[in-house]
């Protein structure tokens, strides 16, 4: 798993540049409706995430390999009014910048859930796995032995990654699945090195 930054959970946007970027990235569309000026902050965060993933892949990806980016879906179904395609926007931008990188909306949630960053309950990979399914229209483009990078904004417990990787590897057991996260979450006062 790769991550570029450290996000300090429980701290506000003023705590660090990363906290500000992550919180802007997570601005909800209903918040933007109430305050349209916030859209620019969300868009800048999306662009910055895409820029950093592009730089990482240009630096680390063997140019002879192809990579499929798969956004880990948000907690809401596509038809839900609070559905947010922010991670999808990131992977689209990255794929547009690197010719050996493509993207697929390979995963979707079947039931909308409360977003995990707003819940007090823990993250359970089994609960997440139960509502994840493969998008069959996208699955037909996966080749055996593909390299898939699951992309998400913050790695907290790894529950979403674990559930998503399991769902993909059930169908495509010879596929290599890695994770790319913009940031790893740490608790306030805990070093990111631990």
Where do the protein language model's features map onto the residues?
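Active-site-facing substrate-recognition patch
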Residues: 1-64, 75-84, 92, 108-144
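Structural motif
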Residues: 66-69, 147-149
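Conserved beta-strand scaffold positions in the cores of enzyme catalytic domains, especially
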Residues: 69, 100-106, 177-179
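Noncatalytic, basic helical substrate-engagement surface that gates or grips nucleic-acid strands
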Residues: 72
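Generic recognition of short, well-ordered alpha-helical segments
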Residues: 82-85, 89, 159-163
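Glycine-rich phosphate-binding loop and adjoining helix at the ATP-binding site
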Residues: 84-103
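PRPP/pyrophosphate-binding module of the type I phosphoribosyltransferase fold
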Residues: 116-194
């Amino acid at each position: 798993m790769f991550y570029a930054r450290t996000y300090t959970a429980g701290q506000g946007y003023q705590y660090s540049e990363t906290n500000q970027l992550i919180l802007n990235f997570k601005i909800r569309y209903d918040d933007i409706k109430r305050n349209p000026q916030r859209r620019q902050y969300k868009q800048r965060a999306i662009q910055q995430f895409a820029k950093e993933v592009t730089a990482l892949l240009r630096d680390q990806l063997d140019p002879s390999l192809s990579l499929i980016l798969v956004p880990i879906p948000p907690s809401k179904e596509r038809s839900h009014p609070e559905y947010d395609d922010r991670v999808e926007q990131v992977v689209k931008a990255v794929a547009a910048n690197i010719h050996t990188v493509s993207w697929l909306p390979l995963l979707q949630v079947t039931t909308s859930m409360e977003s995990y960053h707003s819940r007090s309950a823990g993250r359970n990979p089994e609960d997440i796995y139960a509502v994840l399914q493969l998008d069959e229209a996208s699955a037909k483009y996966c080749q055996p032995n593909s390299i898939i990078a699951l992309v998400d904004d913050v790695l907290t417990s790894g529950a979403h990654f674990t559930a998503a990787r399991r769902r993909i590897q059930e169908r495509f057991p010879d596929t290599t699945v890695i994770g790319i996260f913009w940031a790893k979450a740490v608790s306030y006062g805990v070093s990111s090195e631990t």
